[in-house]
């Protein structure tokens, strides 16, 4: 790992998949005009986001909440634009049923759509059951 990578990751000891989601959301915020919490040092938004996470200057639960909202909005728009009727082929019942209370529904005039979301506490806790299989 070179000095640039170690500078970004030195303060973060969580799951790398969670890091990607959090950094993506924060980079999106920075691209939308949010103020940086660390010196930019000529870095791109993704690197700045990683350095902010590593420095523990962000409220990760807030960043996670914004990522979930963005995901829900995207799924609602996607389902509406596709006119998906009555079934959810993207989420298997066995996967969503093992995450108690994590299924969310999207309702329109025609039908109900389901999607499974990882809840904030499990996401931030770094627990073994983080919804990512095979890694």
From Swiss-Prot:
GO terms for cellular component: DNA-directed RNA polymerase complex. GO terms for molecular function: DNA binding; DNA-directed RNA polymerase activity. InterPro entries: DNA-dir_RNA_pol_omega (IPR003716), Pol_omega/Rpo6/RPB6 (IPR006110), RPB6/omega-like_sf (IPR036161). The keyword Acetylation does not apply. It comes from the Bacteria. One of its GO terms (biological process) is DNA-templated transcription. It catalyses: RNA(n) + a ribonucleoside 5'-triphosphate = RNA(n+1) + diphosphate. Residues 84-106 are annotated as: Disordered. Promotes RNA polymerase assembly. Latches the N- and C-terminal regions of the beta' subunit thereby facilitating its interaction with the beta and alpha subunits. Belongs to the RNA polymerase subunit omega family. NCBIfam families: rpoZ (TIGR00690). The RNAP catalytic core consists of 2 alpha, 1 beta, 1 beta' and 1 omega subunit. When a sigma factor is associated with the core the holoenzyme is formed, which can initiate transcription. This is DNA-directed RNA polymerase subunit omega. It comes from Anaplasma phagocytophilum (strain HZ).
